[in-house]
Design a protein with these regions (language model features):
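Membrane-helix interface segments
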Residues: 61-66, 78, 103-104, 153-158, ...
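Interfacial loop-to-helix transition and helix-capping segments at the boundaries
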Residues: 2-3, 28-40, 122-136, 175-197, ...
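Functionally critical transmembrane alpha-helices in membrane proteins and complexes, commonly lining
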Residues: 2-57, 77-84, 105, 109-115, ...
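Solvent-exposed interhelical
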Residues: 138-166, 202-221
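Hydrophobic transmembrane alpha-helices
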Residues: 49-57, 84, 88, 140, ...
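Transmembrane alpha-helical segments and their boundary/interface "anchor" motifs
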Residues: 37-40, 44, 57-93, 101-110, ...
């Protein structure tokens, strides 16, 4: 267990919460709060890191098989998702449908966690709107075992990521403003590179975790990573939103995550506090 990452999850969860508070009070309608959606990128990158941390060696050494992995992960998603979906359907939560058949299409898409693949807000935000992130997680879990052979030699995985990243940046440039969210923010396919970043970070972590890094050096690394993140965060308003939804934050999020995963500095000690880990 890497306690610092557990504490970081709480911090970024607060940021995501703050990004939605502008609908409650206009005081939150500022760049500082609304940019908190970076927490989504952090969670997807973290997911790739943690899944690799917990399962990469087990799958590689055949201690568990693909089926057992899929059952274990998917079982964590669907029961609660279906419960909230049915409650949302009963309460009549947000869904735009022209009739019964259209309503059923929306419902089935949400039921099977395929709604986020359809780049229309009335689909990916229908019923329980945060479920789009579960669509992404489902894809991550399905694909992860097949990425293990690439992870054995991280250069292959890095090459795949590099090609995908270039294609993404080009695609983002040509995407109309009103289609950005559907194609680049909620779509599991285009959020998959976030997960790969996390997997790559785990390969780096494996090579660095036993390095002799002093508390002073670790603290400098952590402070530097925080400064880098703040620079990206505070000056993000000058960057087109399509990039900020994903690739713009890969570097600062990756640096934050790898710096604190090593648990070598003073800030890691603070984040390892039992209270912070619990919350």
């Amino acid at each position: 267990m890497i306690n610092t990452l557990t504490s970081l999850r709480f911090i970024f969860a607060i940021m995501v919460f703050g990004a939605h508070c502008y609908v409650i009070d206009n005081v939150f309608n500022t760049h500082f709060f609304k940019e908190g959606f970076v927490g989504v990128s952090f969670f997807f990158v973290l997911r790739g890191f943690i899944i690799a941390y917990n399962y990469q060696e087990k799958l590689k050494d055949n201690k568990i098989d693909k089926r057992s992995f899929w059952v274990a992960r998917i079982a964590r998603i669907y029961p609660l998702h279906w419960l909230t979906l049915f409650i949302a359907a009963i309460l009549g939560s947000y869904v735009i449908a022209s009739g019964t058949l259209d309503w059923l299409k929306h419902f089935l898409a949400s039921l099977t966690l395929t709604n986020a693949y359809i780049p229309k807000a009335d689909y990916f935000f229908s019923f329980n709107s945060p479920s789009w992130s579960l669509c992404c997680e489902q894809l991550f879990y399905i694909c992860f075992p097949f990425l293990i052979p690439l992870a054995k030699n991280y250069k292959y995985l890095l090459s795949v990521f590099g090609i995908v990243a270039i294609l993404m940046v080009v695609g983002m440039y040509f995407t109309p403003e009103d289609e950005i969210k559907g194609f680049w923010y909620v779509n599991p396919i285009t959020r998959f590179p976030d997960f790969i970043v996390g997997m790559l970070l785990f390969q780096l972590y494996e090579r660095l975790k036993n390095k002799n890094i002093t508390a002073l050096q670790g603290s400098i690394i952590e402070i530097s990573s925080i400064i880098l993140f703040l620079i990206f965060y505070l000056y993000a308003a000058d960057i087109p939103k399509v990039y900020r939804y994903s690739c713009y934050y890969w570097l600062p999020v990756a640096v934050i995550l790898i710096s604190f995963s090593l648990q070598k500095g003073i800030f890691s000690r603070i984040l390892s506090n039992r209270f912070l880990v619990i919350i």
